[in-house]
Swiss-Prot record:
EC class (word): hydrolase
Keywords for the protein's UniProt record, in alphabetical order: Hydrolase, Protease, Repeat, Serine protease, Viral capsid assembly, Viral release from host cell
Transmembrane segments: none
Descriptive protein name: Head-tail preconnector protein GP5
GO BP term (any one): proteolysis
TRI repeat intervals: 321-358, 371-417, 418-455
Protein EC: 3.4.21.-
Species annotation: Enterobacteria phage P21
InterPro entries (alphabetical): ClpP/crotonase-like_dom_sf, Peptidase_S49, Protein_C
Pfam family, any one: Peptidase_S49
3 X 38 AA repeats, as annotated region: 321-455
Family classification: Belongs to the peptidase S49 family.
Annotated function: Scaffold protein GP6 forms the scaffold for capsid assembly and is required for binding of the 5 and 4 protein products. It is subsequently lost from the head during maturation.
Database matches in PANTHER family: PEPTIDASE S49 DOMAIN-CONTAINING PROTEIN, PROTEASE 4
Length: 501
């Protein structure tokens, strides 16, 4: 149905207009099409447009670098996308309305911002208690995918719970305010029964159906135990998926996420739980993000993770793989997966679960450990670490090489240097374990101790041994250290190493 454009027609015809001629042609082509005009004549330019020509003229103008209207505001190169109210699937709008925000609208806005040359980053301004599970996981995956193109940050202002927490976790960085509420990583389902009310009213409803589960959960009868059990299994699976997504996006372990037991964290406690990165005033969010982006453009680094935080997350990832339930009986494969950069705990668990358990071995001590503790390694720890890291090296091959190498000058042992670190104070037990790790260096120990300061958790002897074995085989510092020590006296050792198969 043609729109009523009488007010525009009245202003456009028989009235003086201040229009540039080329744009005037486009304007009247567009208006003529809306009026149902079959043609447009411009005598001064000797141009005649028929109906298809009017459409082509309008389309050509719109395609000539004219971007579609934005559905977000841009401040300092930051596109601010509001995410408020209940989150729903297929709302059909790009802006929140009637207390709801659609997952489809969030994705559409993000895609538009990614294509907008004036947008350097996106800030999701979130104030939502959550919403539907339907569509939530796909939306979160899209946020995670699009953040590879431009930074996407989340501001919890002041609530980002449940489904909103899922979306926030998919962002590059999460900001919280002093009174923010974040978390609630869990799933719920409700059932209503009108059976008692109908009985009192004398109403009897008979459901006629085909298929044993066709009317499961209907509101006309009390919930049967077997149906309740099925529903419980469904929400347990959904919670597991929820936790795995948050863990993948944030770098936390699944156990750490599920360990929150759907608790809600306020302000600083959200950061301590690993669900947020920085506490700010909501009014400063845009300037904080813009400053970070400016720093990155100038060659600085995005203040997303300090070196200590990065080391802590990497250690958590490694230990999450080595100590997960699926790694039992598959320790060798778990160690290999832990050494793969970017391998998440969830991905490793899936691979381990599909793999057959490895055959048990007679000894739990690795060949690398045997090389490091042999008598000939005393005073030659760096060379021993180099040998221990070599494929197919055995203690029998290493001993004559170590014996032929001169011992290092007497000085503080690696253990003494590590134990003397400031970071070792209050963490002596962990420092002792690090000092015993094959291939460990003072700087590596310092970083690990700093990352674990005040947060170390007791681990079993088998877990410690497994972690030490991983460090022995995946520490580049050990190999570099061995090479760096080659001098005139060590040339023979290097030549002997190079000649080995």
């Amino acid at each position: 149905m043609r729109r009523n454009l009488s007010h525009i027609i009245a202003a456009a015809f028989n009235e003086p207009l201040l229009l540039e001629p080329a744009y005037a042609r486009v304007f009247f082509c567009a208006l003529g099409r809306e009026m149902g005009a079959a043609s447009l004549s411009v005598p001064q330019q000797q141009v005649q447009f028929d109906a298809p020509g009017m459409l082509a003229e309008t389309d050509e103008y719109m395609a000539g670098g004219k971007r579609p209207a934005r559905v977000y505001r841009v401040v300092n190169g930051i596109a601010v996308l509001p995410v408020t109210g209940t989150l729903v699937h297929r709302l059909g709008g790009m802006r929140p309305f009637s207390g709801m925000t659609g997952y489809d609208g969030i994705v559409a806005c993000l895609q538009q911002a990614m294509a907008d040359s004036q947008v350097r980053g996106v800030l999701l301004d979130i104030d939502s208690p959550g919403g539907q599970a339907a569509g939530a996981f796909d939306c979160a995956d899209m946020i995670y995918r699009l953040r590879q193109q431009k930074p996407v940050w989340a501001l919890c202002n002041d609530t980002a719970c449940s489904a909103a927490m899922l979306l926030a976790s998919a962002c590059s960085r999460r900001l919280v305010t002093q009174t923010s509420r974040i978390g609630s990583i869990g799933v719920m389902m409700s059932h209503v029964s009108y059976a008692g009310h109908l009985a009192q009213a004398g109403v009897d409803i008979t459901l006629i159906y085909s298929g044993a589960h066709k009317v499961d959960g209907n509101q006309f009868e009390a919930l049967p135990a077997e149906v309740r059990q099925d529903m419980q299994q469904r929400i347990d699976a959904a919670r597991r998926m929820f936790a795995e997504k948050v863990a993948m996006y944030t770098g936390l372990s699944v156990d750490a996420v599920t360990g929150t037991e759907a608790a809600v964290f306020e302000g600083q406690s959200g950061i301590e739980a690993g669900l947020a990165d920085e506490l700010i005033n909501a009014s400063d969010a845009i300037s904080v993000m813009a400053t970070a982006l400016n720093s990155n453009v100038r060659g600085g680094t995005m203040p997303q993770l300090t070196a200590t935080e990065a080391a802590a997350q990497e250690n958590q990832r490694v230990m999450g793989i080595l100590t997960c339930q699926e790694a039992k009986g598959r320790e060798q494969l778990a160690t290999m997966l832990a050494g793969q950069q970017g391998m998440s705990v969830e991905q490793a668990r899936a691979i381990l679960a599909a793999a057959a358990p490895q055959q048990p071995v007679a000894s739990t001590q690795s060949e690398a450990d045997r090389i490091m503790v042999c008598e000939e390694a005393n005073g030659r720890e760096q060379l021993a670490a180099t040998l221990a890291a070599m494929p197919e090296m055995t203690v029998e091959k290493a001993r004559p090489i170590l014996a032929a190498s001169p011992q290092a000058d007497a000085g503080p042992s690696l253990r003494d240097q590590i134990m003397a670190l400031d970071e070792a104070k209050g963490a002596e037990a962990q420092a002792e374990q690090l000092a015993a790790c094959p291939g460990m260096t003072v700087e590596s120990a310092r970083a690990v101790l700093a990352a674990g300061s005040g947060k170390a958790e007791p681990v079993s002897a088998s877990t410690t041994a497994m972690f030490e074995h991983f460090m022995a085989n995946h520490s580049p510092a050990a190999v570099q250290g061995g090479v760096a020590q080659t001098s005139a006296d060590g040339d023979a050792d290097v030549k002997m190493l190079m000649a080995m198969p």
